[in-house]
Amino acid sequence: MAQNHMSETMNDISAESPDQPEPPRTGYGVIQAYLKTLDSSPGVYRMLDHESRVLYVGKARNLRARVSNYTRPGHTQRIETMISQTSRMMFLTTRTETEALLLEQNLIKQLKPKYNVLLRDDKSFPYIMVSKNHAFPQLKKHRGARKGKASFFGPFASAGAVNRTLNQLQKAFLLRNCTDTMFENRTRPCLQYQIKRCSGPCVGKISQADYADSVRDAERFLAGRSTKIQEELGAEMQAASEAMEYERAAALRDRIKALTQVQSAQGINPRGVSEADIIGLHLENGLACVQVFFIRANQNWGNQDFYPRVAEDMSAAEVMEAFIGQFYDNKDVPRQLILSDDIENADLMAVALSEKARRKVEIVVPQRGEKTELVASAVRNARESLARRMSESATQAKLLRGIADAFGLEAPPNRIEVYDNSHIQGTNAVGGMIVMGPEGFMKNAYRKFNIKDGEVIAGDDFGMMKAVLNRRFSRLLKEDPDRQKGMWPDLLLIDGGAGQVSAVAEIMEEHGVQDIPMVGVAKGVDRDHGKEEFYRPGENAFALQRNDPVLYFIQRMRDEAHRFAIGTHRAKRAKSLVANPLDDIPGVGARRKKALLTHFGSAKAVSRANLSDLKAVDGVSDALAETIYNYFQVR
């Protein structure tokens, strides 16, 4: 709407004006000549080359002042080159600077100027739609215009995020996903009903009033009232269990589990942010990645990465401002944008976006609290995504050759093993090994090493690494002593510095396998990506060039090892924190435990069951039922 309004107020005062003197061919003289025609109006300017290709689009609160800046010295090499290529300029005046900002971003997307930040991936995002034009509303994925009798929830970052959420919502609320035509022509329940994904409204398996209650609960969940709904379902489940309505209790338990899985899949779940996009930026060596998390109704509906075209001398503020302007040119704007970096025209951008959204839009760069943590997560994702993109830009073979060159190997390695440990003050300690080969990560070769209490001194990182490598090579020597089965590494990468490398070298010497090359990978003094130091036994530390693709490749392997190790550690820690009393009963293994929980809904319900109810469970003998009953009676 703002763009159409602006078109009525613009004046083109380009070089074709008959009273304007003929400017020199290119460069500073061209720009100097145009200054004579400009006033202090706000507007947008375009710089064009001798073939009328647009080099740059900019906006200004004062066109004359802004353009005059180009005639002064002190520009970067990129700007100097752009000026030298400029042979013509065009100007469009606007009534306000806000209009100029909106027009600038629109023209950049249309014209794709060579010297502007350019968002190349301009995709739309899907929503969840609950139809309202039917007695039994449908739940489905939706793209495109949001109109008609329906409720829309989103946006979601990807179709996958929508599909996963829909899958769990159908388990929880049993809402139909069939078309109206299919609904009207059903004579018996479909497969969705059989697998408990639909309540069967098409054949009268549920009343319209009860179905409407399920729709209401689904909408409440999507609108951010998930905790309240889960509390209500939990109370219903408890009441059903106490009334010995075990089938209903089990169904309610499954609904709670499905809703919990929706939340756990969301990763970050902010408590104090109801509607916002969290935008994190990472710039490195002339490349950029922007990560956007979509927060709606206090829920994280996924994240998406973008790779705008940038130049190496562009600042984070410049890239962030350009991204925001272009990204929201054709998308709904949330009530709040939470940014990792300040932008120069934050107030102006907020006004422009507020006009577009027809409500207040706030732009914030948090300095502390939960929002700071959310932004840090977005930046971390952006950094990791950029690292993956850079490492994938070269072929795997080329990267492996680069590894060989960097570390003085005789040939590119076919198998690289990367090791990392994870623990909290020595508790639940684990080691992780990931493997990289000619075709990428070899996930079927990953291994985890549980470090038992007493095996090493708590918190002794060197001792943990020695324990892991001792186990690894003891097994290799036993299973493949002749190194003929492709199980032996061509290179070891150790997460750590000189101390870890020395510890590993001791183990290698003890096992007589000193011929296997090893390198320690340690972050630099300020622990920044790009400043890693590398250690080999008995040698001084060395580094690689920050823009070397091999460095990104190593970072990617090191980060994957860290992810694998810390994930294993968290699983081990979670298991130790959540002890199920059924695990301690003699004769109750995984199969019978599952049967008991399925039948009663929870371990607490099992503990309250009488003997006859326990005997009724499939797979539980009379003797085992008595054992279970007696176990809980004496507790």
Curated annotation (Swiss-Prot):
Keywords: Cytoplasm, DNA damage, DNA excision, DNA repair, Excision nuclease, SOS response. It is found in: Cytoplasm. One of its GO terms (molecular function) is excinuclease ABC activity. Residues 1-27 are annotated as: Disordered. The keyword DNA repair applies. Residues 227-262 form the UVR domain. GO terms for cellular component: cytoplasm; excinuclease repair complex. Belongs to the UvrC family. The UvrABC repair system catalyzes the recognition and processing of DNA lesions. UvrC both incises the 5' and 3' sides of the lesion. The N-terminal half is responsible for the 3' incision and the C-terminal half is responsible for the 5' incision. Interacts with UvrB in an incision complex. This is UvrABC system protein C.
